[in-house]
Structures are given as C-alpha cells and as structure tokens.
C-alpha cells in the first residue's frame, strides 16, 4: 500500500471526471472504473482518504443549477409546467457522485468494491466530516441494491463451494469456528445454516444464521458446539435453536 502523490492525484481527478461525464461509451467507462478501483485498492489509508474526499467535495450537485431549478419549480407550482420543473429540479440535485458509483457496479467485483469502500468511509469519516455526503449517498444506494427482495436465501451445507465455507469461518462473529472439523460439525445432518446472498456477490454471505435441531432447549451453547457430541436424529426434532447469527459486511 502507498500514498497518493500530486501527479497521481491529478490523473485520478481526470479519470473521475471522465467517469462522471460518461464520455466514450459504456466500454470506456467500465475500463476507467476498473483503473480507478485498482488505483484505490493500492492506496494506504491516507491515500484513500484523499481519494474519497475528492469524490465527496468535487462531485456533488452544482449549487447554481440547483438554485435555478428550485426557482423555476417555485414559479411553476401553479402552472401546467409544474411536473416538468419538478423533474428538472430532481435532475439538478442528482450528484455526479451517483454516476461515479454506478460505474463501479459494472465491474465483476464492483458491488463488493463499493461495500468495502463504504467500510473505509465508516473508518475515516470521524477524521474528515467532509466525507459524510459521500457516505450518505452510498448508504442510500446500497440500501436500494441490497433490498431483501433482491437477495437470495440459500442453505449452506458441507457440499457448498469451498470459498463459501471459508467465508463462514472468516465471518463467524458469535462463536469462533476453530477448525474444519468444527465447521463440519455445524453443518451436520442435525444442523442448518442459511445465508442471504446478493446476485453480484455470489460467494459472499451477507448474513448467516446457524441452527441446531433438537428435542429440547439446550442448557448452554457449549453443548451445541461440542464436536464430539452424538449427532441428533433430525426427523425427531421438535425444537430449532438459533445459536449464532453473523452480519458479515461492515459497509
């Protein structure tokens, strides 16, 4: 990781403006977004803070355009032009930041990049309040993109892709998964594990829950985590114990 020198900052500004303007068509925009993402990932915290501050402070709505559109809207409230003026005001308030953020979603790992970028914002925002505008805008977009209607609920088993299983071990936030045998125990026939996934992040569980099937409530969670305990006959279960739920994405 490295910082951001003056020459690099000039080039990044150029790429950001080109991305925001959309010149050159979709393919060119995707290539520029890819270069920006690669540059960002190579930066240290100081460099990332500078990168994000440029987006936050230089790509907001144009105050003069907003003021004019608002005045036109006020003048048109009682006329047949009201809806046209309202649309113009809405467009004037739409920042270039939104166009920039949308460019990243076209990348293979673009949605995950934006989720991680917001995690950086949450870390850095205390040191630089100017980042709040970008954080709020990105939060709004992510909330829309990650609406539960767009998510896929999947059961995770021992036969799920290895990358998904590795993510369970990495992200378990309640009861640490200590080994592969520990994980296998939690995915045995008397257990269930379900996770929400986003179509653009198929190997990244967003939130997952671990369930034990039993015939009674457990006295303590350690009995559920005991790898050497006998496997319960799942068809006889009349109790489902939700013993762990993990939210995996900081952003």
PLM segments and residue spans:
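Extended, composition-driven regions rather than compact fold-specific motifs
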Residues: 1-251
């Amino acid at each position: 990781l490295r910082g951001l020198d003056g020459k690099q900052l000039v080039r990044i500004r150029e790429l950001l403006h080109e991305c925001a303007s959309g010149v050159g068509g979709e393919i060119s925009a995707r290539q520029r977004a890819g270069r920006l993402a690669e540059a960002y990932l190579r930066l240290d915290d100081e460099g990332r803070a500078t990168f994000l501050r440029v987006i936050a402070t230089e790509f907001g709505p144009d105050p003069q355009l907003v003021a004019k559109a608002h005045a036109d809207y006020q003048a048109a409230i009682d006329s047949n032009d009201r809806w046209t003026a309202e649309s113009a005001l809405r467009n004037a308030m739409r920042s270039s930041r939104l166009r920039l953020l949308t460019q990243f979603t076209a990348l293979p790992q673009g949605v995950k990049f934006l989720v991680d970028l917001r995690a950086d914002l949450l870390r850095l925002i205390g040191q630089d309040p100017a980042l709040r505008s970008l954080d709020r805008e990105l939060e709004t977009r992510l909330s829309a993109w990650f609406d539960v209607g767009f998510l896929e609920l999947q059961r995770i088993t021992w036969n799920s892709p290895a990358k998904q299983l590795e993510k369970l071990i990495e992200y378990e936030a309640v009861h640490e998964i200590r080994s592969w045998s520990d994980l296998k125990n939690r995915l045995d026939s008397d257990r269930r594990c379900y996770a929400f996934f986003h179509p653009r992040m198929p190997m990244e569980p967003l939130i997952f829950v671990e369930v034990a099937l039993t015939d009674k409530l457990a006295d303590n969670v350690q009995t559920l985590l005991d790898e050497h305990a006998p496997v319960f006959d799942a068809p006889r279960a009349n109790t489902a114990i939700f013993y762990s739920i993990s939210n995996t994405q900081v952003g």
